[in-house]
């Protein structure tokens, strides 16, 4: 038997996820590898989810815990829209997630989250949440998982405060690509999305391959 703290470390060590705040929206990206110890358990793991028309979220950690949380939050977002006629704002969604996580703080959900969204009044928003509900509103970029040190190196070098979504997509893909080359627990492709005034756009593998070719030409 392993302790809760040891269990937490085991499930929080893998993956790479990144989020960038752009002047016209938010970019989110993840790898696709799911690990169980030293075993690559899944090469097509879904770690990027559309929560609402203007909100998307990345997950790291225990898949079961994260998927359970996503089902709850997605349902609450739909109920909110049915009752009010409006989409839930990114801040409201983040606060709701924080409350759920904090309510389970004595036996926490083993997941670390990045939430990106677009508020038609307040613009683009980027948040990160820890397993017990702590919220950070990010003013530039963030990364989670075992590949995050490498990803942060690229983000620090490439990110600019006036970055657009078009440039942010390339930066995010470059950060993920670099992390996957150096981190054994990250790999097997990239999931990518942006959120702006028009909503959430999830990119296809072919589109992501196009971004990778652009990056490789510049190297």
Curated annotation (Swiss-Prot):
Enzyme Commission code(s) on record: 3.4.25.1
Localization per record: Cytoplasm
Catalytic activity annotation: Cleavage of peptide bonds with very broad specificity
GO MF term set: threonine-type endopeptidase activity
Superkingdom to which the source organism belongs: Archaea
Propeptide, residue positions: 1-14
Active site feature: 15 (nucleophile)
Main location: cytoplasm
One cellular-component annotation, GO: proteasome core complex, beta-subunit complex
Gene3D superfamilies, A to Z: Glutamine Phosphoribosylpyrophosphate, subunit 1, domain 1 (3.60.20.10)
GO BP terms in the entry: proteasomal protein catabolic process
Protein task: Component of the proteasome core, a large protease complex with broad specificity involved in protein degradation.
Subunit structure, as described in the record: The 20S proteasome core is composed of 14 alpha and 14 beta subunits that assemble into four stacked heptameric rings, resulting in a barrel-shaped structure. The two inner rings, each composed of seven catalytic beta subunits, are sandwiched by two outer rings, each composed of seven alpha subunits. The catalytic chamber with the active sites is on the inside of the barrel. Has a gated structure, the ends of the cylinder being occluded by the N-termini of the alpha-subunits. Is capped at one or both ends by the proteasome regulatory ATPase, PAN.
Protein family according to the UniProt entry: Belongs to the peptidase T1B family.
NCBIfam families: arc_protsome_B
Name of this protein: Proteasome subunit beta
Organism in which the protein naturally occurs: Methanococcus maripaludis (strain C5 / ATCC BAA-1333)
This protein's encoding gene: psmB
